[in-house]
Swiss-Prot record:
PTM annotation (N-acetylserine): residues: 2
Post-translational events: Phosphorylation by TORC1 upon nutrient replenishment inhibits STM1 and causes its release from dormant ribosomes.
Gene: STM1
This protein's name: Suppressor protein STM1
Other comments on record: Present with 46842 molecules/cell in log phase SD medium.
Main subcellular location: cytoplasm
Protein's organism: Saccharomyces cerevisiae (strain ATCC 204508 / S288c) (Baker's yeast)
Subunit comment: Associates with mature 80S ribosomes. Binds to the head domain of the 40S ribosomal subunit and prevents mRNA binding by inserting its alpha-helix domain towards the mRNA entry tunnel at the decoding site, where it blocks the binding of tRNA and mRNA at the A- and P-sites. Interacts with EFT1; interaction sequesters EFT1 at the A-site of the ribosome, thereby blocking the interaction sites of the mRNA-tRNA complex, promoting ribosome stabilization and hibernation. Interacts with CDC13. Associates with the telomere-proximal Y' element.
InterPro entries tied to this protein: HABP4_PAIRBP1-bd, STM1-like_N
Region (Disordered) residue spans: 1-153, 219-273
Residues carrying Phosphoserine: 32, 41, 45, 55, 73, 118, 229
Presence of keyword Calcium: no
Amino acid sequence: MSNPFDLLGNDVEDADVVVLPPKEIVKSNTSSKKADVPPPSADPSKARKNRPRPSGNEGAIRDKTAGRRNNRSKDVTDSATTKKSNTRRATDRHSRTGKTDTKKKVNQGWGDDKKELSAEKEAQADAAAEIAEDAAEAEDAGKPKTAQLSLQDYLNQQANNQFNKVPEAKKVELDAERIETAEKEAYVPATKVKNVKSKQLKTKEYLEFDATFVESNTRKNFGDRNNNSRNNFNNRRGGRGARKGNNTANATNSANTVQKNRNIDVSNLPSLA
């Protein structure tokens, strides 16, 4: 069997010929899907420096150095007893303004020595005078005091007492004319006399009449009442021929609209005479 590939020539490879590797052609991906490629590492130089940092509770939560575990891992360099948190100067209560009070201000605020001495001397003198007055009053109180009065002076004193005074009678003037003129005396006389009209009271008028009451007839005539009611009903409707155009009954009844009930007994009605 003949080989048809012999017509193409010698297929033996030449050892001197350099065979180039095939070039891989990569097609550009236009898909919007995320590729399975790890994200690039953050560049700290490109980070925004003016970015506001969280504060408050959010800052405490994001602080990675805070926490009990991190604090326990740190070494305590100084003891809490050796270092004082509040270090103040020995002259903390002293004024550092450099201003001092004058002697006049000191004397006005705390008192002058000379004035204090004079005030003490005056107080001692007042105390000695009060002691002398108290001693004199005690001596006078020790001596008995007797009031001597004569009998006439005692009687006059009792008579002048307000409880022993005799009430004086009221003086009454007996001149009747003088009293009458004093009552009629008027500073401004009336120019016009007003006439007062007296109104008469209205009297009530009573109407008297005798009324007699009699028991009504207990027996009722139902037959007449039924007949009258039927007649009245026929008169109002115009009878059986009213629907057919017979208005003769209505014409006769319209002339006499008031009908007298003859079944009423007049003797049973009360009399107004």
